[in-house]
């Protein structure tokens, strides 16, 4: 039996789509030196090559892909978006505005100088910034800009072409910029990170290991009684001195949980909870020959929970003010916008931050009620909320404003982005509403993006040969300028206007570019995870601004 593969793919859009995705994902795993091509560029290259052979796909699949992607971007940004906008993140907001705004203006200037149309200019901006949200926003706005027929098809093809030609140059140039810009500016990021660490009492280790606390029991002897010198537990400050706290005391056969007024007596058996290294550092008066093994005394259920910050009396306070250790709890991680932060007592808590806390189950539950709520450990997605807000986003996108002879539509990209932000924000405030497991959210977001990239490449592939010959050199030059010049402008603004610490500044700059590979290089250069503080500060707001930049460049382009 003979099978004509070309006819088979042309006759089955679903099969063609998944063939493109599979081949593209394989290609995306290849590396050029230390740089991995990535899924987006892999799928785009394969789809462009097949598009040259006149394979095509239903545009409805492309539209659904970009809608799912941009909605999930909003859901991710939602928990921290408003806190960055309205609280002490004004520096990060200003940095993101400078980065995105300068890139937009430079792209507009270069596009006009080279005589390109809006498709090439917007595509070049998206590729140079390695930002799919720009591509999505521009594509959606083009479809609602009044263009029709061949003019719209050409603009969309040029949009894909500009993105494909400049994406890799944007990624590689930013990675090299992240590696060498600190050296060219004579900035020692390691010293800057250590300075912040000293000021805030931070652990600068980017690869900090997290251990669970353990419980061990000891009998109080004369040395320990002499060490206590009649002071109660509050006066002794056991945790400050040892890193452990007393969870239980057995006295005269009676087991009890002590309060701060308890005084240690000869013969008491005490259960100490702390990290393994804290037990190892205990004074010999605790340990030598006095450890006991009592099932009832050691019977404590230590749990680790992720607590979402919600309560108004906690939001806006500093992490150190929670005094978790005074409540018998241990802080393992602080996560903001899916980014692990260094544990810093001076971090101002935002609504939606996640604190990973260990301790006795009752104590963790008590502290969770005071801070917010324990994140639901469920694999079930609230599909009703997902679909309802998706519908709301589409309806918002239908809104059109009329100004005399000029009309402006919000568009699906902005509408879905706003609806996603609201769903993410409400989820951070109501633990039982709109729950989407992080793995499910990432899968839908990535799948939507890959479907969109496949559709973009297949639709543009037939014209890539001609386009590459006509504007290839100009496009690569423009991509390099738009990728690096806004980074330099952002650095000068942050260093000399905002006077930010350099480690935080470089992290914030990579967050404004939403580029995780470059962020890893900055952390490696600083030998610290301190830059993650800056990265998290700009990342969420930059995703939103980049989508709006894609919409704005089409709106303000003459003739659209």
Curated annotation (Swiss-Prot):
Disulfide bond annotation, renumbered to this chain: none
Membrane topology: Multi-pass membrane protein
BP GO terms, sorted: potassium ion transport
Pfam families (UniProt xref): Asp-Al_Ex, TrkA_C
Limits of the RCK C-terminal domain: 200-288, 292-373
GO cellular component, one term: plasma membrane
One annotated GO molecular function: monoatomic cation transmembrane transporter activity
Locations listed in the record: Cell membrane
PROSITE patterns attached to this UniProt entry: RCK_C
Transmembrane residue ranges: 8-28, 32-52, 66-86, 91-111, 158-178, 383-403, 406-426, 447-467, 475-495, 539-559
Record's keyword annotation contains Nucleotide-binding: no
The entry's keywords: Cell membrane, Membrane, Repeat, Transmembrane, Transmembrane helix, Transport
InterPro entries: AAE_transporter (IPR050144), RCK_C (IPR006037), RCK_C_sf (IPR036721), Transp_YbjL_put (IPR023017), YidE_YbjL (IPR006512)
Predominant subcellular localization, coarse grouping: membrane
Family that this chain belongs to: Belongs to the AAE transporter (TC 2.A.81) family. YbjL subfamily.
Protein name stated in the entry: Putative transport protein ESA_02488
Organism: Cronobacter sakazakii (strain ATCC BAA-894) (Enterobacter sakazakii)
